[in-house]
């Protein structure tokens, strides 16, 4: 789905609602950009923004045109951007892969402009109790938290908020991340054969991901 179609109704998707609120012409840093799918959606929604990204590996050839990419280890390396240079920072499904969040949160605090906001998203702790994906879909989709062998441990939002406060950030809002259209499609796909569309609808229906929005004081 091209997110340009969501410009009139970004509230249908938790991530889109956050990105839609970034000041016009601002700078957005995506930490943990992976294959760039989410970053491309952000660009479709907000082509006016200046995009930056960082990842341990990354696929910068897939990122939006003009996106400045840095390859690095966020548990060990400081990021190359200046202090207070970002209007917004997004971090999608990264914290559950890390052993130590100290440097990540310190860098988010350093890089945000005063009043800037950060959006974190991570699997809800309840995902440890969901059924495992089996058969031909094993390894192709994550339903149970441990379907992804690179996950370390769930990160409850309350714990993430506490660590963020220690880094000088203010929790603003938290909840369940959903795309309401995908969630509604579960009413149809629940009766269908296993497919990526069926699993995607299911995770949005059950509230697979939790989010936290943080603000830098000022």
Predicted regions and their residues:
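Conserved N-terminal segment of class I S-adenosyl-L-methionine
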Residues: 1-82, 88-92, 105, 174-177, ...
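Short glycine-centered segments of the SAM/dcSAM-binding site in methyltransferase folds
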Residues: 27, 115-117
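Short catalytic micro-motifs in class I SAM-dependent methyltransferases
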Residues: 93-97
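S-adenosyl-L-methionine-dependent methyltransferase catalytic module, highlighting the catalytic core
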Residues: 3-6, 37, 99-107, 117-217
């Amino acid at each position: 789905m091209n997110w340009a179609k969501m410009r009139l109704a970004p509230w249908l998707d938790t991530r889109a609602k956050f990105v839609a609120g970034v000041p016009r012409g601002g700078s957005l840093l995506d930490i943990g950009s992976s294959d760039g799918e989410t970053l491309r959606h952000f660009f479709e929604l907000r082509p006016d923004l200046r995009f930056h990204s960082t990842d341990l590996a990354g696929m910068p050839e897939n990122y939006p045109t003009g996106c400045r990419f840095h390859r690095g280890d966020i548990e060990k390396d400081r990021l190359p951007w200046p202090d207070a240079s970002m209007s917004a920072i997004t971090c999608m499904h990264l914290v559950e892969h890390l052993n130590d969040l100290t440097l990540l949160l310190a860098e988010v605090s350093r890089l945000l402009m005063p009043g800037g906001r950060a959006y974190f998203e991570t699997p809800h702790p309840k995902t440890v109790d969901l059924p495992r994906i089996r058969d031909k879909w094993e390894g192709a989709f994550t339903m149970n938290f441990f379907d992804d062998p690179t996950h370390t441990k769930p990160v409850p939002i309350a714990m993430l908020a506490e660590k963020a406060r220690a880094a000088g950030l203010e929790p603003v809002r938290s909840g369940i991340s959903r795309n309401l259209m995908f969630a509604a499609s579960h009413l149809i796909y629940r009766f269908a054969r296993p497919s990526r569309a069926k699993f995607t609808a299911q995770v949005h229906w059950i509230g697979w991901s939790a989010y936290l929005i943080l603000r830098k004081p000022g």
